[in-house]
C-alpha cells in the first residue's frame, strides 16, 4: 500500500507542476530598466553596437569600418555577458531631438581609398548588418510579408540593417557593390496625455543607397541636390545608388521621423519577442509527453512486477518466464552495490552534473520571471556564469557524498578533480577558439581583462566553494547499502546481442534527445541566426520532460540489465542517458550543413567548437540525471525485497 500511496503523491505533484508550467508557458516580460520620460526637444542618444553576420559568426566593432565618427568615441560600460557576446557599444554621431523631425541631415563625407573600399566590399560580401541602440531598444528593419495560410500581410522585424548590397546596373552583367549611406529612421513614442512627456517604444530604419550630388566645392554648408530639407526633397528608392570603389566619395545622410504609438512602454518589446510558431512548440511538448507516458507505463509495470510481489511475500508466480526474470535481478544482490571501476572519475562527473543541473534550473526560473529578458543585454550569459561558479558548492557536496559511499578516504583529491576536470576541458577549447577569433581581429575575442575576471571566478570563487562543499559532504555519514556485498565478484553470464553495452547505451540516448530536438532547432536558430529566444516557459516544460525521460529510460534499461544478471550498472546508467549528447552533436552538424551558410573555415571551427562544449555540458547533465534515477531505483528494489 505504501508503494501505491507514494505513486499517487508523485502523480498529484506531477500534475500540479504541469499546470503551473503551462500557466507560465508564455514567459512574461519584466523590463530590465526603469522607463525614461522625454520632453519635446530633449536630446536622444543613439549608440552603435557591433557589426554581425550569420555567414561568418564573427562580430566587429562599428568603427572597424570607416564610417563617420563623433569627435570622441566613448565606450559604454558592459557587463560580462555583453563582452563575451562580442558587443561593443559606443556613441554615434547621429543627433536626434525628441519629437522634432529632421530631413536629409548630412552626417559626413568619406573618400574611399583602396583599403577602405576593400573593407566595405568584404563586409557586404559577408552580409554584415549594422546594429544600433536607442533607449535600450535595438534598431530593426520592418519587412512586410504575406503569410501563406492567412493571405494578409504581416510585419516582421530584422535586427540591424545591411552595410550594403550587391547588384548590377540595368543592361549590365557586371556585379557592383553599393553602400547604404542614407538612413530613414522612425522613432515611435507613447505620449502621456497628462504630462505631455513621451516614452520611446520603437526604433526602426529603412536603409537606402543613393549617390548624393551637390554643386561647387564641398564644405560644411554645402546643400545636396539629391535631398534637401529646404525644398522638402526626400531620398527615393529610384535614386542612383552609391557605388563602393577606390577614390569614390560617399556622403552619409539620415532622416528622423517621430510617430506616436498606442503601444505602451511596458509592451514595447512585444513586437521583437512575438513568436508565430507556438503551435510547433506545443506539438513538440505533446510529442515528448507521449514518450514520457510510454516510459512511465513501463516503469510502473516493472515496479508492480517486482515490489508488489515481494511486499506480498512472494505470491505464486504465474509463469516460469516471470520466475526466471525475477530471479535474475535478485541473484546479483551481492554484487549490485560493488564500487565500479574508475569510481573516482564517476564521482567527479556526477558532481559536475549536479553543478550543471543547478545552474540550468535556477537560470530558467529567473528567465521565466522576466529577469533575463533581452532588454537586459548579456544578462543571460552573465547569470549562467555566476550561477555555475556558485553551484560549485553543490558539485563538491555531491561528488564527496558518492565518494564516501564507495568507501573512499581522500576527499581533497576528489574535490580537486571536481573543481578542475570539466572547467579545464571547456577552457582549453575556449582558449583555442578565442585565439582563432583574435587572429580574425574580431570584437568577439575576449579581452585580457575579461579573461582575468573569468580566471578569478574559477580559481577565486568556484574552486574554494567546491572544496567547502566536498568537506561538508564528507562529514556526513555514508549511505548504507541495502544489501551486503560479496567478497568475491560474481561471474557475469554471456549477454544477448541487444544487451551489448555500446548498443544499449546508444539506444538509451535516442528518447531523451527526441524529447528536446524540436526545441533545440529554435535555440540553434536563435544563437546562430541572430534571433531572439524568449520562450523560457516552453523551454522549462521541455526540460522537465527531458529529466523525466532520462530518468525513466535509464531505469528501464537498468532493470533489463539486472535481469540478465549483469550488475555493472554504475557507469552504464550514466552513459545511457548521457549518450543523448552524441545525438545532439550529430544534429548540430546536420543543422550546420542544412541551415547555415557558413563558408569560412574559421567560422566552421567556431561553430563546431562551441557545439562541442554544449554537447559536453549536455552529456554531464543528462548522465547525472540518469545515474541518480538508477541509484534510487536499485536502492529501492533491493531494500524492498527479502533476500533469501
Swiss-Prot record:
GO terms for cellular component: endosome membrane; Golgi membrane. The keyword Zinc-finger does not apply. The keyword Manganese does not apply. InterPro entries: EMP70, MFS_trans_sf. It is found in: Endosome membrane; Golgi apparatus membrane. Residues 303-351, 399-418, 473-501, 556-573, 622-644 are cytoplasmic. This is Transmembrane 9 superfamily member 9. It comes from Arabidopsis thaliana. The lineage of its organism: Eukaryota, Viridiplantae, Streptophyta, Embryophyta, Tracheophyta.
Amino acid at each position: 500500500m505504501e508503494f501505491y500511496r507514494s505513486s499517487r503523491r508523485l502523480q498529484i505533484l506531477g500534475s500540479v507542476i504541469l499546470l503551473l508550467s503551462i500557466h507560465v508557458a508564455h514567459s512574461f516580460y519584466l523590463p530590465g530598466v526603469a522607463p525614461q520620460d522625454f520632453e519635446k526637444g530633449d536630446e536622444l542618444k543613439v549608440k552603435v553596437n557591433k557589426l554581425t553576420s550569420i555567414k561568418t559568426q564573427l562580430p566587429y566593432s562599428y568603427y572597424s569600418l570607416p564610417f563617420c565618427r563623433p569627435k570622441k568615441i566613448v565606450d559604454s560600460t558592459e557587463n560580462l555577458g555583453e563582452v563575451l557576446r562580442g558587443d561593443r557599444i559606443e556613441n554615434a554621431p547621429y543627433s536626434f531631438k525628441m519629437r522634432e523631425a529632421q530631413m536629409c541631415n548630412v552626417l559626413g563625407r568619406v573618400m574611399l581609398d583602396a583599403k577602405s573600399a576593400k573593407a566595405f566590399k568584404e563586409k557586404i560580401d559577408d552580409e554584415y548588418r549594422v546594429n544600433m541602440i536607442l533607449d535600450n531598444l535595438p534598431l530593426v528593419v520592418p519587412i512586410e510579408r504575406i503569410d501563406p495560410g492567412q493571405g494578409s500581410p504581416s510585419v516582421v522585424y530584422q535586427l540591424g540593417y545591411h552595410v550594403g548590397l550587391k547588384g548590377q546596373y540595368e543592361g549590365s552583367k557586371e556585379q557592383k557593390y553599393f553602400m547604404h549611406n542614407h538612413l530613414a529612421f522612425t522613432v515611435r513614442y507613447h505620449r502621456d496625455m497628462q504630462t505631455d512627456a513621451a516614452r520611446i517604444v520603437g526604433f526602426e530604419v529603412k536603409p537606402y543607397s543613393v549617390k548624393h550630388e551637390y554643386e561647387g566645392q564641398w564644405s560644411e554648408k554645402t546643400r545636396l541636390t539629391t535631398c534637401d530639407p529646404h525644398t522638402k526633397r526626400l531620398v527615393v528608392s529610384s535614386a542612383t545608388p552609391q557605388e563602393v570603389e577606390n577614390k569614390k566619395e560617399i556622403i552619409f545622410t539620415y532622416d528622423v521621423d517621430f510617430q506616436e504609438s498606442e503601444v505602451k512602454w511596458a509592451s514595447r518589446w512585444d513586437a521583437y519577442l512575438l513568436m508565430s510558431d507556438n503551435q510547433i512548440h506545443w506539438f513538440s511538448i505533446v510529442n515528448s509527453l507521449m514518450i514520457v507516458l510510454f516510459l512511465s507505463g513501463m516503469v510502473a509495470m516493472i515496479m508492480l512486477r517486482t515490489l508488489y510481489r515481494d511486499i506480498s511475500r512472494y505470491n505464486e508466480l504465474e509463469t516460469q518466464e516471470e520466475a526466471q526474470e525475477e530471479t535474475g535481478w535478485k541473484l546479483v544482490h551481492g554484487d549490485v552495490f560493488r564500487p565500479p571501476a574508475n569510481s573516482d572519475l564517476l564521482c567527479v562527473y556526477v558532481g559536475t552534473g549536479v553543478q550543471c543541473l543547478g545552474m540550468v534550473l535556477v537560470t530558467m526560473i529567473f528567465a521565466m520571471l522576466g529577469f533575463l529578458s533581452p532588454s537586459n543585454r548579456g544578462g543571460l550569459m552573465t547569470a549562467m556564469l555566476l550561477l555555475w561558479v556558485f553551484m560549485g558548492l553543490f558539485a563538491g557536496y555531491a561528488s564527496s557524498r558518492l565518494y564516501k559511499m564507495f568507501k573512499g578516504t581522500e576527499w581533497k583529491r576528489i574535490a580537486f578533480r571536481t573543481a578542475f576536470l570539466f572547467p579545464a576541458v571547456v577552457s582549453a577549447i575556449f582558449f583555442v577558439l578565442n585565439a582563432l577569433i583574435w587572429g580574425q581581429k574580431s570584437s568577439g575575442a575576449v579581452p585580457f581583462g575579461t579573461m582575468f575576471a573569468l580566471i578569478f571566478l574559477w580559481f577565486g570563487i568556484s574552486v574554494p566553494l567546491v572544496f567547502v562543499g566536498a568537506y561538508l559532504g564528507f562529514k556526513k555519514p555514508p549511505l548504507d547499502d541495502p544489501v551486503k556485498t560479496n567478497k568475491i565478484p560474481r561471474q557475469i553470464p554471456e549477454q544477448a546481442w541487444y544487451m551489448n553495452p555500446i548498443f544499449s547505451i546508444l539506444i538509451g540516448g535516442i528518447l531523451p534527445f527526441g524529447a528536446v530536438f524540436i526545441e533545440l532547432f529554435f535555440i540553434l536558430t536563435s544563437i546562430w541566426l541572430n534571433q531572439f529566444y524568449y520562450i523560457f516557459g516552453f523551454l522549462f516544460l521541455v526540460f522537465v520532460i527531458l529529466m523525466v525521460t532520462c530518468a525513466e529510460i535509464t531505469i528501464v534499461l537498468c532493470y533489463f540489465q539486472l535481469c540478465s544478471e549483469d550488475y555493472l550498472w554504475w557507469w552504464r546508467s550514466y552513459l545511457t542517458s548521457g549518450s543523448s549528447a552524441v545525438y545532439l552533436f550529430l544534429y548540430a552538424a546536420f543543422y550546420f550543413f542544412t541551415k547555415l551558410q557558413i563558408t569560412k573555415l574559421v567560422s566552421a571551427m567556431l561553430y563546431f567548437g562551441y557545439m562541442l562544449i554544449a554537447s559536453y555540458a549536455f552529456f554531464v547533465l543528462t548522465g547525472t540525471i540518469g545515474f541518480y534515477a538508477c541509484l534510487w531505483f536499485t536502492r529501492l528494489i533491493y531494500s524492498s525485497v527479502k533476500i533469501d
